[in-house]
């Protein structure tokens, strides 16, 4: 009996430990999201149409793989991390009977996008300030889910949530598009990113926009220096 009681205690301790670890991980992600949200408020990301995510491209690829995608005319479309909607506003214009929903952490970018949508008189697209982690089955199902420029920049818990959304919020014949960065193509851009991160280490007290401009100038200096080296080597 004592041994059994001890085993139960150990199991209970293990479960408690897992719960604590899960809570800590969740708190860490929430803190990260707060930092991300502030950065998105401070610096507006360029949002424009991305050809690979156009509905006709997604439907064509689905057909090539033997799938039976939903008709584009009345499709329900969700974009995660939509910024101010530059990628789906143009599609909402082209498919007036389809419905488009975009979500993003940034309230300022969502506000900007909705103002643009209202000025264009569009009624088939809505942008919502929302955390990806807060989406569940009650959010509805969609025929096309677009996740571009997010996967490679978020922690694992958000990646897991994206996959969950593509599982639970995708219609029976739905298509999900998830882009991600890979080597060797992204190695050079990663090097630029590392130069910028190194350059900003001593300037962390500066506002984000000022740090961004500062590090971009560092990149320009590096580029100019490399150009000088090339000219010297040619002589």
Predicted features and spans:
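Conserved SAM-binding loop of SAM-dependent methyltransferases across substrates and taxa
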Residues: 84-97
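A short acidic, Gly/Pro-enriched loop at the edge of an enzyme's catalytic core
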Residues: 136-145
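Conserved SAM-binding strand-loop segment of SAM-dependent methyltransferases
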Residues: 121-132
